Design a protein with these regions (language model features):
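Short, highly charged C-terminal tails/helix-capping segments
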Residues: 144-161
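Secondary-structure transition/turn motif
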Residues: 36-41, 58-65, 113-117
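Charged, low-complexity intrinsically disordered regions
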Residues: 91-131
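Charge-rich, low-complexity N-terminal segments
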Residues: 1-54
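Long, contiguous binding/interaction regions
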Residues: 134
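Short, internal acidic amphipathic alpha-helical interface segments
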Residues: 61-108
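Short, well-structured hydrophobic secondary-structure segments
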Residues: 43-72
């Protein structure tokens, strides 16, 4: 647990120990806001909101235009089933999520999870980063399953902006 260190110092140390910390961002609504890379080439945020006894792990993903086009070219039944399947699937990860949907087409999604101070350990932080990432991966895989994928991109991250 955290002995003789404040939360910011402890979380920063854990992230540095695992080579995950990429930058510290100024955020007027937070006591600290770290940008982390977990896993490689995936950016996430670790934030402690002001006056809260918890930290938030968040991962926001913008759906690439070519995938939006694939969704738009499908029928409405498929579009609605996809959004429903996405909600059911994400709910099983026990994370919070927000889907930005316009006319049954997913535009972007944000997956978040909260860890309260009394449960904050290095193990819990890393496990939560993994769970948030796996929930994001679920969204990506479900898009591929429902709408088909494009020819293999040169870089896996080309799929989502």
């Amino acid at each position: 647990m955290m002995i003789n260190m404040n939360i910011e110092e402890q979380v920063e140390k854990w992230l540095l120990d695992e080579d995950l910390l990429r930058e510290m961002k100024y955020d007027e609504n937070a006591d600290f806001h770290f940008i982390v890379e977990f896993p490689k080439e995936n950016i996430m945020d670790v934030v402690k909101p002001k006056d809260k006894d918890s930290i938030i792990i968040a991962c926001a993903t913008q759906v690439a235009p070519q995938h939006i086009n694939l969704m738009q070219s499908s029928d409405m039944k498929t579009q609605k089933e996809f959004i429903l399947d996405l909600n059911f699937g994400l709910n099983q990860f026990l994370v919070d999520f927000e889907l930005q949907v316009n006319n049954n087409i997913l535009q972007q999604f944000v997956v978040t999870e909260q860890i309260f101070e009394d449960g904050l350990t290095k193990d819990m932080l890393i496990r939560t980063l993994k769970r948030v990432f796996k929930a994001k991966l679920h969204c990506i895989w479900l898009i591929d399953k429902k709408f088909g994928s494009l020819p293999a991109p040169s870089n896996e991250n080309d799929m989502f902006i």
